Amino acid sequence: MNSVSPSAVQYIVGGGAHEDKASASSKRHLGHGAVPDGIREGSGEPDEVDRLKAKFMSAWNNVKYGWTVKSKTSFNKSSPLILLGQSFLFNNEDEVERFRQTFVSCVWLTYRREFPQLDGSSLTTDCGWGCMLRSGQMMLAQGLLLHLMPTDWRWSDCHALTDVDFEVLKPRSPSRPAGMSMPSFSSSWSSSIPQINPSPGITEAHRRAPARCPSASPDPQVDALHRKVVSCFGDHPSAPFGVHQLVELGKESGKRAGDWYGPSVVAHMLRKAVARAAEFEDLAVYVAQDCTVYKEDVMSLCESSGVGWKSVVILVPVRLGGESLNPSYIECVKNILKLKCCIGIIGGKPKHSLFFVGFQDEQLLYLDPHYCQPVVDVTQANFSLESFHCNSPRKMNFSRMDPSCTIGLYARSKTDFESLCTAVSEALSSSKEKYPIFTFVEGRGQIYGMEGPSGGSVDAPAHIFTCSRLSRNNKRGSTDEFVLL
């Protein structure tokens, strides 16, 4: 009998045996996004019944999403795979290893349980409702890695894996090309990463240091930066980008713990969170208005303080079709993911958020937040990083992507921003549709005085969406509306 691969172990939970006992009624009431009112409402300590409900939800969720790793993820060895602006061709072991280093180094943020109680509720888990928050966290985390870490940084202390299966599959039909199955990776590093070019804050000694073999001990200063990024998303009230802080910011948009958060609302919550984080005064987040990036607004935002030009994360909420994805925009999405300035796309299937980081052929590569893990105390000096990195790459067809999504971009300097505008505009011009996904224009956008998803006094201009082109019969909430393309 085949052994269980480590990639599958990431999704297995001891409560999996409850799957057979879950009735149809249980599945209906514990479906994605459903939170028992007794848990969500109230500010007192959760009673034993609430704890049991939360544990059952966690166990059922892990069983449900554990099914996705039963089948191996196949990769076409003759087609390039794009991952956050980098291209990989799996025709040799070095390329497979390079992909492994890059993918596993992405920060993976998932459901957590047993964290401090969320304000205004008795919830101690985001299982079943916080997947879009986690996807947004992952996109911001990727931006922080680019902002803080050395260029081409790779996590040197990867999971200790033993199962290796690089089986080369024969074509089953003319429509299925030969591929490479990659359920897990070896724990031994077989190649060195390129010479790294540190970001500001890295000393000259680090700048001149030779390229480090991934199997060597991590650089203490770089490791500290890595932990700083992860700890910003800790599940406790003082973490600047943690669930507790995001839920608090969501109240300004009429949201509360246990509600469904759409990609546009999450974009504005991330903008506010970064604006209020004193430790990131050199970083700003701009949210596009009406599918338009106003260059003068971005310039004003990045030059608004005495610290010089701020690096900027640009978030563009869009809707790529009506009830389903418009196939005409697939090529544009691919072209955006090819750009090194792209930090991913948050979206996914309806009520099922995923963080898209790349693609191969007609399939998207993603990180899945739907695995519920125990909380990690990131305030400890040497907290474990293993649960914040995923070693199981997953794919899905573009056709299954929900049209509501938010695109993330990052520019370190003014020059980078100008290059970003040019590169993204060229990528968007590939669309066969009359209207591009979004545009860059000179000048400023309209400043709205009303309180909405972008409201709050901590940052201006306040960008919210006007949906004049949306049908009045659209069933989506007003705080999660998009301009239809």
Swiss-Prot record:
It is found in: Cytoplasm. It holds the Pfam family Peptidase_C54. Its main location: cytoplasm. SUPFAM superfamilies: Cysteine proteinases. It catalyses: [protein]-C-terminal L-amino acid-glycyl-phosphatidylethanolamide + H2O = [protein]-C-terminal L-amino acid-glycine + a 1,2-diacyl-sn-glycero-3-phosphoethanolamine; [protein]-C-terminal L-amino acid-glycyl-phosphatidylserine + H2O = [protein]-C-terminal L-amino acid-glycine + a 1,2-diacyl-sn-glycero-3-phospho-L-serine. Its EC number is 3.4.22.-. Coiled coil: none annotated. One of its GO terms (biological process) is piecemeal microautophagy of the nucleus. This is Cysteine protease atg4da. It comes from Danio rerio (Zebrafish).
